[in-house]
Design a protein with these regions (language model features):
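Class I S-adenosyl-L-methionine
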Residues: 1-15, 20-113, 212, 218, ...
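A contiguous loop/helix-start segment that scaffolds small-molecule binding in enzyme catalytic cores
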Residues: 3-7, 77-82, 137, 146-250
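Short hydrophobic alpha-helical segments that form membrane-spanning helices or hydrophobic packing faces
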Residues: 20, 121-125, 176-177
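Cofactor-binding loop segments of dinucleotide-utilizing enzymes, especially the Rossmann-like FAD-
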Residues: 37, 143, 195
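Short, well-ordered alpha-helical microsegments
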Residues: 39-42, 119, 173-174
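Active-site catalytic pocket residues across diverse enzymes, especially alpha/beta-hydrolases
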Residues: 46, 126, 180, 184
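Class I SAM-dependent methyltransferase SAM-binding "motif I" and its flanking Rossmann-like core
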Residues: 89-160, 202-205
Length: 250
């Protein structure tokens, strides 16, 4: 029996945003180990496979990473083809490489199917990460370092002209906005995307100075979110409407 591990990026949530190659991998799996943010609809592509939930979300882990690694080995040698179905992309703020290396150390064949990462969600709502004459680059950064504090990479990016896409930062939103204010960037456009790509997705746009107030005015908001900050957002229709309204009253 051939043993194999395929890491599959399930995308940001909408089941239609998985790749065709990802669907083919799911259909060929003997066992599927899937994350919390994976759409249940994706599991329906394979009625015969063993399906095991190993999700992690908001600090609540059903399994430790070491346990997941061992489960990959166990199921591969017992059944054959294991698909590790991971939210977003397996190699973007995930343990994809760790799982891949661990499987290979046991002589298991491996392959990777990339997925759409949540950092690409701004485009789904017409927020450009780059724009000619405004922003020539974008930076994707996690909000939290290994010490639980705001990451050093994020702190070093606050003054950059690059558009910032901040993942796993909702719990530190106030501290992050204060960093921008300390850098005299209170007017910088900011957008928050919660449950991006899902039917209940909510998008809040504002600026550093008022984004927290706008967020607090929406008490029903719940779910994983990303923070986007940069001048390129000013080209979005939300900001253009505000600008035109301001010009009329000025």
């Amino acid at each position: 029996m051939r043993t194999k591990l395929t890491l599959v990026g399930a995308g940001p949530g909408d089941p239609d945003l998985i790749t065709l190659k990802g669907i083919k991998a799911i259909r060929s799996a003997d066992v599927i180990l899937y994350d919390a943010l994976v759409s249940p609809e994706l599991l329906e592509y394979n009625d015969c496979a063993i399906k095991v939930f190993v999700g992690k979300r908001a600090g609540k882990h059903s399994k430790k990473q070491s346990e997941i690694n061992d489960m990959i080995i166990y199921y591969a040698f017992k059944y054959g083809h294991v698909v590790r179905l991971k939210g977003g992309d397996p190699f973007v703020f995930a343990h994809g490489k760790e799982e891949l290396d661990y499987a290979e150390s046991f002589g298991i064949d491996t392959s990777v199917v990339p997925g759409i990462s949540s950092f690409q969600l701004p485009g789904l709502y017409s927020y450009p990460l780059t724009h000619r004459g405004i922003s020539q680059s974008f930076t994707v950064v996690t909000a939290t370092g290994s010490d639980g504090k705001i990451s050093e990479d994020l702190q070093n990016s606050i003054s950059s002209k690059s558009t910032l896409v901040i993942l796993m930062g909702m719990r530190k939103l106030s501290g992050i906005m204060q960093l921008f204010k300390n850098a005299d960037r209170k007017d910088l456009p900011v957008a928050i995307i919660i449950n991006g790509s899902l039917p209940d997705a909510q998008v809040i746009s504002g600026r550093v100075r008022d984004i927290e107030e706008k967020l607090n005015a929406e008490p029903t908001l719940n779910g994983p979110g990303i923070i986007v900050a940069g001048e390129s957002l000013s080209t979005h229709s939300d900001y253009q409407r505000v600008l035109k309204s301001w010009l009329k009253t000025a």
